[in-house]
Each structure stands twice: as structure tokens, then as C-alpha cells.
Amino acid sequence: MSKYLGIDASTQSMTALIIDVEATPRIAVEESVIFDEHFGGRYGVENGTIDLGGGQVHAPPLMWVEALDLLLAKLCDHGHDLSRLRAVAGSGQQHGTVYLNQTAAPALAGLDPARTLAAQLAGVFSRATSPIWMDTSTTAQCRQIEAAVGGRQVLLQLTGNTAFERFSGPQIRKFSQTDPQGYDRTAHIGLVSSFVASLLAGRLVPVDPGDGSGTNLLDIRRRQWSPEALQATAPELARRLLPITPSTEAIGEISPYFARRYGFSPTCRVFPFSGDNPCSLIGLGLVEPGRVALSLGTSDTLFACMDQARACDSGEGAVFCSPDGINYMALICFLNGSLAREAVKDQYSLDWEQFAQALRDTPPGNGGGLMLPYFAAEIAPHVPEPGVVRQDLDPADANANVRAVIEAQALSSRLHSAWMDVPVTSLSVTGGASANEEILRVYANVHSCPVHRFQTTNSAALGAALRAWHGCEGGESGEPMGGWRETVEPFTRPQTTIQPDPGAARVYAKMLRAYERLERSAIDR
């Protein structure tokens, strides 16, 4: 068997990607289920989420259950032989938490292949919806956790991060405070990643250090839960969590449910699922310190591979363990990613080709016009209330506003990633918007470096599949970095490279200071 499956449970979709490593390694299959298309009416989701107001953004975990069945059925319907899969690994949108009652473990162990997953697992949740990474409603809980461990800097040094509203720990604390009965009914708390892995394994499985880093609960250097952080977060939290499992060690073989229903080999191994950002680190080939990548998705994320856990003192950035089991990743997340791009596109009734043409028709620097595209509350910089700011920019000028939003995103990515202290000599780009060369051209010029685009935009699913392959080929023995390089290299050769224009790069070097002043003045107000 020479095929490996990666599954990515992201915000808006669930994706399967199969690699075939026989002879010439290649991506053999990509298949997705878009949540809004299949489940929008049933679960009331928009862009895969439910906006509950007051900064609360959730998603129904039963929708993810149903999506997994549908995704595997689509693979079979399209003629893909799942019996040839040697192993599966996966990724999940980070920070989201899933709350399960005491019936979950026996229900997973006794799944009937004649029935759907959703029909059998509808009753296993102690909380009907899961707070996800877009939720900003836990500021009070963040401050409480920081105070309980001895202050913001103590938590930063312990976990690699200050308390973030979207992180799992503050969300768990809020649930324990606002619904103590629901918390009492909760026998197990998982992340999106470990929950989907539990479905495939047919039992509750642990979180890995990569995704555990996004909880405010993990000792970043020991790669284990921090007793101090657990105690500061919620009562009896430790018993609701399984011990952290190494990212590179198999957690077992696939559940008989999937072998009988979809034809998986009973010996197909399941490796720990990790977060989507840590898996993208692998999927873009960032397995050596000093390499930098950008994901242009629902949110935009700039991240780098580091050999040490270097924390961001300002609290804007985050540090996670890499699922390579060796390194760390520095990350900064900008919530107004595709959200802002789509808002501008829709405001002027453009399609994506017209959006790209607007960038071609406007000069670098936009004649001095600037935008702060806070269509939603922003993570970096910390902007708690939405509000778009324009300077020397006519709201009626569609082309100028298109350029302004892209230039703002690129300038912000450069400005707020300086803490990583990693020279950006090239930028590997993934995500849906990476298909737009004009957007990438702006990033190449702002960062004054080549931008590389790859065969697939599904870097998290690819990273998961590569983790499954690497795990089967010796990862459990602590494979050295060279082994990772051999694993990722065939899949991370750039398909397209966009070189910076020196003249435009000089324009943006000056523009960066003007953007920084506008941002600071808006935040200070």
C-alpha cells in the first residue's frame, strides 16, 4: 500500500487529500465538502459558523460528524479504493472545543456500519455547539486566567502565549462559569482535531502538542498539559482531558466502522490530528528553522519555523509546537482575511477577475490612499470593535478600494511579524486567495522577496497526509530533520514564483511607516 490520506476539518469545509508515494510521489486525489452547500439549512450555518451575537461564534460538531461520512462517501462514489490507504492523519481548525458526555466513549466503540455516524452520535454532546477560533467573547476569562497563574508574563513564558479570547482555555472557563450544569455533564473535552480523529479511531483520542499549543493549557517546552494552567482555567479540568500524545506516533488502527462501510483496510493506521496551521507548516515544507509562509484563507496567517519557543511579548503573535516533533512555529493571525477581501469585492459588485483587474489598473502605493480593513474585530493588532478606516481614499472608487484592502493586509503582515525575528527571504503562500497572482504580486513587493505558489492550496490536508507517510516510514523513532526534508521535498516544489519589483518595493518601504502611523492613531482613538 502506497497511499496516505490527509483530512482537514476547516472552518468552511472538510477536505480529503490522498498522496501516492509509489514511483513518483504525487497528489492523487482532492475532494471537499462545503458546509454551507450541504448543511446550511439544516444547521443554520453561514460560512460554516453560527453567529450568536456578542462576539460569540460557534459551529455544530454534529455537522462535522455528518461531513466526514459524506466526504468518504464521495471518495468511494468517485471510484477511489480506500483499501489501499496505509495510514490517515488530519488537521482541524484550531482552538475550537468539543464537549462530550459519558455516552461518547461507548458510542464510538460500538458504531454500526449500517447506520450513519450522525444517527448514532447525536446524543454524545454535553454542549450542542462548539465555540471556534472566531469567538471573541472571553476577554474577562482571559484576564482571570492570567491573574490566577501569576500574571500575563507568567502565562506567556509557560504556554508560549498570553491568554487569547479565541483560545480553548478561556472558552472552557467561560462554559464552566455560564453553564455549570453542562460542564458537570461533560466527561471529555476535545479539540476539533482530536474529535475527528476519535471518530476514525473509534475511541476517544488525545490532542497532539501542535494543536494543544493553541489552548493556553500546554507547557510549550515540555509539550505536556501544564498543571498550573489547568488549575487556573476550570474545576477538575485535568480529568476531562486525555494526556498529550506525540504528533508522530500512531494512535491505533482505523475503526471497524470505516473498514466495513467504506472499505478501508483494517490495518490502516490513524495518526494524531493536529491544528490546521501546524499541518500547513508541514504541507508547505517548513521543516527547517528560518522558513516563512503565508496562508490566505478565512483568516490570513503568517507563520515561520523556529528551533526555539520564542514568545511574542506584545501578545499579538502565538507560538505553537510543530507536529514534526522537533521544532516550533511562530504565527500571527489576521482575522480580516478573505472576510475583508470578499466584503470589498461584494461592496462593488465585482467578480474575482474584476478584482484582479482592479489591482492591475492601480499603481503600487495607491496614490497614498490607505485603508484599515477592520470589517470584523481584529486579532492583530487588537481591535475589539469592527470599523473600516479610510485615509485619502474615496469610498466610491472601486479600484482604489480593492488595492487598498490588499495593500493593508500585506503591510500589516510585514509590520506585525517583526517579532518573529526571522528574515523573510522568500514567502511560501497557500490558501484560496493564493490563486490570484495580482494579490501575490502585492505581497512580493511589500516583503521585497520572491513569493512561491504550490500545486495545491490545501496545505493543511497535504501536511496531514505527509505526516501519515512520515509516521509510517520511521517517524516514531524520532526521525532526524533530514528525514522530514526527504518527505516534504517532492510535494513542495513551487509551481509559480513571483519576483518583487524593486521600484514597487521601495514605494512600500516608505508606505509602511504611513500605514503604521494610521494604524496607531486609529487604535489610540
Regions found by a protein language model. Give the residues of each.
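Active-site core segments that coordinate phosphate-bearing ligands/cofactors
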Residues: 5-6, 15-18, 139, 143-159, ...
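Structural signal for short hydrophobic segments within the conserved structured cores
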Residues: 29-31, 131, 242, 452, ...
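Active-site donor-binding loop signature of nucleotide-sugar glycosyltransferases
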Residues: 33-35, 246, 500
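Short beta-strand-loop/turn "lid" adjacent to the catalytic site in phosphate-handling enzymes
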Residues: 51, 55-56, 77-131, 161-166, ...
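A structural motif corresponding to the C-terminal end of an alpha-helix
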Residues: 81, 232-240
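Carbohydrate-associated surface elements
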Residues: 135
